[in-house]
């Protein structure tokens, strides 16, 4: 069964490079493996997809996603949204302002005069609670508190990643709230058509 205790994997990523304690919460690297032996590597920091190891058109196993080599790289800020979860709101909100049920709200500003991808500290920069559900599935969970980045309502979010035997990576989102709010969740996965070894351009 695939789990975080494995030291050998197709992508060559080292689990210890993804382990840290951030605001009292531990980060780690999770390996999903399907019955064909191919793999997906995911960090619970930002739900970052760090590797997807599948065959290319010539049958050569390659990492087809632009990922990260370590928690340090994930937190560097150079590419904060690269292959991570995005929320509470994917894309820009002009001037960080929206109106809901006749009430105006002001969100955090982090992209010129606008609000981008959930604010200055969006879901991409949060440590999620992780639960591996067998070798091919991972659930990430967190609660976004009332007022986080200016949003109204508490938002309870679960994101499930499932790696099928057809080499499909399925991402499902479930969010519930205790108050009317806005939400637009997505994953900012960046794919490459050519092979990329983790950490180096080919």
Protein language model regions, located:
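Surface-exposed acidic/polar loop and edge beta-strand patches at domain peripheries
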Residues: 2-200
